[in-house]
Amino acid sequence: MSRGLGDVYKRQIIIRAIAIAPDHIPSDIITHSYIFDNVNNDLPVVSIAIAPDDLWDPEIGMHVTGDAFWPFYPYYGSNFWNDWEKEVHIELFEPGGIIGFKQNLGMKIFGGWSRAEAQKSFSFFARSMYGDGDIDYELFPGSGVNNYETFILRAHGQDTVMFRDGFQTSLASDNNVIVQDYRPAVVYLNGEFWGIQNIR
């Protein structure tokens, strides 16, 4: 019996593995993202791994309208208006491919009417039920803050310029007011390119 070379992957892929044996407790699930085409090395990459049904299933999927919704914008009653939280695995890669952090978190759809847009914002929650109760990482380099319980990946909603919100809040940062930090990132959802969103 000889070994073959296996499959050749030329695009992003997420590998999830678990060890199972009769009469033994299964291992933890191990997840790792392989990002091959990060052409913009100036931005961090956020890879989100989630069970597909938790996104797309008409009954339990949080990213879809579902079966009972108002047929006019912003589609009230759609699944994405529910306050559902689903378990995900997040990996943040700094420019150059260096892993920043990887962790299981809770994820919700975030925002107001932007929930009805194709690219939705997500909020993430570190909870002990998923593993660690906080994220020990400096999400915003130079901020001096390296411990978070939650953060947002904010889509651009109706802002087609895609950086207006972050830019405007950064203008106030030197005026002794509290503002949200802003960091654009390339996002992959289950290995699919999902656009550029802002870490907030």
Description of each model-found segment:
Residues 11, 36-40, 200:
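C-terminal, active-site-flanking charged/polar segments
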Residues 14, 18-19, 40:
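Intrinsically disordered, low-complexity segments enriched in small residues
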Residues 23-29:
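Short, exposed coil/turn segments at beta-strand boundaries within extracellular/luminal domains
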